[in-house]
Amino acid sequence: MAALRLGDKAPNFTAQTTEGEIDFHNWLGDQWGILFSHPADYTPVCTTELGTVAKYTDEFNKRNVKVAALSVDGVASHHGWIKDINETQNTTVNFPIIGDEDRKVSELYDMIHPNADSQLTVRSVFVIGPDKKIKLTITYPASTGRNFDELLRVIDSLQLTAYHKVATPANWNSGDDCVIVPSVSNEQIPELFPKGHKEIKPYLRMTPQPN
């Protein structure tokens, strides 16, 4: 199928997970979501990734984000591997891992890239908004573990810009100044941005983070 693009509706599915069967859209409810795939259970990089996700539970909860992982391994394999993750990463996995043995979800989300590996999922990441639309996609090669601090940073930006007429500049972190979007006129700025602003160029106007 065609690759999913930003703004597309995240396809719904039902699947067996380590926490029972889920209907993806119902499971998300009105929260933000991250769906990410890993190549295989009992592999080193994936073990560190899922351990990190578990350690970041409080950070995801603060942002109202639900997380689900996926590979083409079965749920029984996931349960065995979770014991290793908990032991080696000093954590407790507390999110569902989807068993996608029939590759239904992997194909729905274009997570298998034949020129990389014809059988296993790549390291895909999908951030999904409360409207069930895709807000971010990132694909990593099997050799590179994901940076979950960066994913939190992007979620901070997505949630900020969903409710305020700003964008976030390069290397922005929560608390840094933001860019006022071009659609905002200078006349609107005092009402929308009472903290003030600095005009560097007519198209480049900065303001303290509004939230």
List the predicted regions and their residue ranges.
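Chalcogenol-based redox active-site neighborhoods
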Residues: 1-211
